[in-house]
């Protein structure tokens, strides 16, 4: 990637040796360092470490980094929304793309982009006059040092459960990677109910529901949305939201706590702004009310459990698969949690990539003891159509795994499809017949 510099001594900075010239600087990252000699052959004379980028790009903007297995996207989006509604100029970078001041600037890509691209986004936000830069921080980015050299104003932990073991190889390494983000003295906000959290106590505040914490929920109701009473020291505030589920109470609590820690002010005013946040597309998105159909990105055992527990008074029907060429150990666990909560299970594809979709389904099925519940249909579109058609009035259909993704990866092909649109099409056909 090529990023133009604000200093006359360098025309541009690149992490690709093939782009280098005598007037460029080459960024030495964990992945690009092996190409240093190739950059020299191109005539490049200036070599930069990530900490040097502050000399050439504008990065002096408060950075808020959110990490965790689940909840990063919703928590980040809620912080972004609250700050915007309070009148600040804000940038947001994450799974859904790069946003500035309620405008989509770049479409979705990696949760946390490569280091030079990330610095370029921060530089662009600073030049646009943004007061804050909110970003999701993935475990891959922490491990690959894609956030090296950045000075965060606040770091936030949502939770830690099992994920990405295809990359990290063990749960222990995954947990260590997440926790390493909180090793320094940077101001931090930690989920006190997360038993796996390990962090530097300096400048640490916490939030929680079950355990005493800096920001804590004194009482709450999850019937028909969220109603909660939040306390911080001697201050109390009421929080209302149309979002569903205890996991979203955690997400909103983290967001409210983060904004209060960043700007101070009245806790109640921040809660009032949080009430305006309508959620994120593909995250507990109610595509239809009658029948009730919900689309969500949940793709881990814990993420699925949180969704299931958000519907304690309804009969649950679930449709999901598991990503190919990814952590295989979680597949039977996903099957087991579905077996525990769901009345009927539709097993299908979720980006099978190079794997055989039927073999992935078989691995999920190993965790399901009541196999009579299962319907196996590897074609995700057909599975959704069938699930919608067979849905009964007292049931809720939860379509999990892909959220707002707009394509299905099969082999090397990316085939356009979106769960939400497939549901609406199926409902349209049913209503047309009736």
Curated annotation (Swiss-Prot):
Cofactor requirements of the protein: Mg(2+)
Binding site for ATP: 68-74
Biological processes, Gene Ontology terms: cell division; cell wall organization; peptidoglycan biosynthetic process; regulation of cell shape
InterPro entries with a match to the protein in the record: Folylpolyglutamate_synth_CS (IPR018109), Mur-like_cat_sf (IPR036565), Mur_ligase_C (IPR004101), Mur_ligase_C_dom_sf (IPR036615), Mur_ligase_cen (IPR013221), UDP-N-AcMur-Glu-dNH2Pim_ligase (IPR005761)
Reaction catalysed by this enzyme: UDP-N-acetyl-alpha-D-muramoyl-L-alanyl-D-glutamate + meso-2,6-diaminopimelate + ATP = UDP-N-acetyl-alpha-D-muramoyl-L-alanyl-gamma-D-glutamyl-meso-2,6-diaminopimelate + ADP + phosphate + H(+)
Pathway: Cell wall biogenesis; peptidoglycan biosynthesis
Modification after translation: Carboxylation is probably crucial for Mg(2+) binding and, consequently, for the gamma-phosphate positioning of ATP.
Keyword Cell cycle annotated: yes
Gene Ontology CC entries for this record: cytoplasm
Gene Ontology molecular-function annotations: ATP binding; magnesium ion binding; tetrahydrofolylpolyglutamate synthase activity; UDP-N-acetylmuramoylalanyl-D-glutamate-2,6-diaminopimelate ligase activity
Modified residues (N6-carboxylysine): 178
Function: Catalyzes the addition of meso-diaminopimelic acid to the nucleotide precursor UDP-N-acetylmuramoyl-L-alanyl-D-glutamate (UMAG) in the biosynthesis of bacterial cell-wall peptidoglycan.
Similarity remark: Belongs to the MurCDEF family. MurE subfamily.
Name assigned to this protein: UDP-N-acetylmuramoyl-L-alanyl-D-glutamate--2,6-diaminopimelate ligase
Protein species of origin: Wolinella succinogenes (strain ATCC 29543 / DSM 1740 / CCUG 13145 / JCM 31913 / LMG 7466 / NCTC 11488 / FDC 602W)
Gene (UniProt): murE
């Amino acid at each position: 990637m090529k990023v133009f510099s604000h200093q006359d001594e360098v025309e541009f900075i690149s992490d690709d040796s093939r782009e280098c010239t005598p007037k460029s600087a080459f960024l030495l990252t964990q992945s690009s360092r092996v190409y240093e000699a190739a950059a020299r052959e191109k005539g490049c004379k200036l070599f930069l470490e990530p900490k040097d980028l502050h000399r050439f790009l504008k990065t002096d903007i408060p950075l808020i980094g959110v990490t965790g297995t689940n909840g990063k996207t919703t928590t980040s989006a809620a912080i972004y929304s609250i700050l915007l509604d309070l009148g600040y100029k804000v940038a947001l970078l994450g799974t859904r793309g790069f946003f500035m001041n309620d405008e989509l600037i770049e479409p979705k890509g990696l949760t946390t982009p490569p280091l030079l691209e990330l610095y370029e986004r921060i530089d662009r936000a600073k030049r646009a006059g943004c007061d804050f830069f909110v970003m999701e921080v993935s475990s891959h980015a922490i491990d690959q040092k894609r956030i090296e050299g950045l000075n965060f104003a606040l770091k936030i932990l949502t939770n830690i459960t099992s994920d990405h073991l295809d990359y990290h190889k063990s749960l222990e390494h995954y947990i260590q990677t997440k926790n390493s983000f909180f090793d320094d003295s940077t101001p931090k906000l930690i989920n006190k109910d997360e038993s796996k959290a390990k962090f530097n106590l300096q400048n640490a505040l916490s939030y929680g529901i079950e355990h005493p914490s800096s920001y804590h929920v004194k009482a709450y109701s999850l019937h028909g949305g969220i109603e909660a009473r939040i306390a911080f020291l001697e201050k109390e505030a009421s929080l209302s939201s149309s979002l569903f589920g205890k996991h979203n109470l955690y997400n909103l609590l983290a967001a409210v706590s983060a904004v209060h820690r960043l700007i101070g002010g009245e806790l109640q005013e921040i809660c009032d702004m949080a009430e305006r946040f309508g959620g994120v597309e593909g995250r507990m998105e109610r595509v239809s009310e009658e029948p009730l159909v919900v689309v969500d990105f949940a793709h881990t055992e814990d993420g699925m459990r949180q969704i299931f527990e958000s519907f304690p008074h309804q009969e649950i029907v679930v449709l999901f698969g598991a990503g190919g060429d990814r952590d295989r150990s979680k597949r039977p666990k996903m099957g087991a949690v579905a077996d525990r909560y769901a009345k009927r299970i539709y097993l299908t594809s979720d980006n099978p990539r190079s794997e055989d979709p039927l073999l992935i389904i078989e691995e999920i099925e190993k965790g399901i003891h009541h196999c009579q519940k299962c319907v196996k249909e590897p074609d995700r579109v057909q599975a959704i159509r069938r699930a919608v058609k067979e849905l009964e009035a007292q049931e809720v259909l939860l379509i999990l795994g892909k959220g707002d993704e707009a394509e299905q990866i099969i082999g090397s092909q990316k085939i356009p499809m979106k769960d939400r649109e497939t549901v609406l099409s199926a409902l349209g056909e049913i209503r047309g017949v009736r």
